[in-house]
Amino acid sequence: MPRRREVAKRVILPDPKYADRVVAKLINIIMLDGKKSTAEKALYGAMEIAAGKAGEEPVKVLKKCLDNIKPMLEVKSRRVGGSTYQVPVEVRPERRVSLAMRWLVKYSNTRSEKTVTDKLAGEILDAYNNRGSAVKKREDTHKMAEANRAFAHYRW
């Protein structure tokens, strides 16, 4: 790794509809081939559907959904001697949010609904109600960390 100064984080501008940075970041994660307007339509539609069914504001629903997906712990591989251990480590706050967003998009794409909007809305609602594949992924990650608690002293 070069020993130069740390790279400055790029500032993500808030999205046009809700003026929220989290929504803007999620749009960027959903976006494929630079088609931002398509990603915006899909997310805004999904947020409206989810908010309608949950009976709350769209941004609140999305944030609660992401809070339910965010992992607190994860495992990292650490080589000690000849063997590799899965060492549980706490997840940094920025990484928590980005993992939650990635998992939300990934597991919404595996759903059986017809359109991307419906898939996203379904996964957002499931995560809002503490169900769904993305929440299961968080639980599995926590279980892995708990199972490997014996190796916690190898943390670096």
Swiss-Prot record:
A Pfam family annotated for this UniProt entry: Ribosomal_S7
This protein's record includes keyword RNA-binding: yes
GO molecular function: rRNA binding; structural constituent of ribosome; tRNA binding
Keywords linked to the UniProt accession: Ribonucleoprotein, Ribosomal protein, RNA-binding, rRNA-binding, tRNA-binding
InterPro entries the record matches: Ribosomal_uS7, Ribosomal_uS7_bac/org-type, Ribosomal_uS7_dom, Ribosomal_uS7_dom_sf
Biological process according to GO: translation
Gene3D superfamilies tied to this protein: Ribosomal protein S7 domain
GO terms under cellular component: small ribosomal subunit
Superkingdom in the source lineage: Bacteria
Quaternary context: Part of the 30S ribosomal subunit. Contacts proteins S9 and S11.
The protein's role, per its UniProt record: One of the primary rRNA binding proteins, it binds directly to 16S rRNA where it nucleates assembly of the head domain of the 30S subunit. Is located at the subunit interface close to the decoding center, probably blocks exit of the E-site tRNA.
Family per record: Belongs to the universal ribosomal protein uS7 family.
Protein name: Small ribosomal subunit protein uS7
Organism (species): Citrifermentans bemidjiense (strain ATCC BAA-1014 / DSM 16622 / JCM 12645 / Bem)
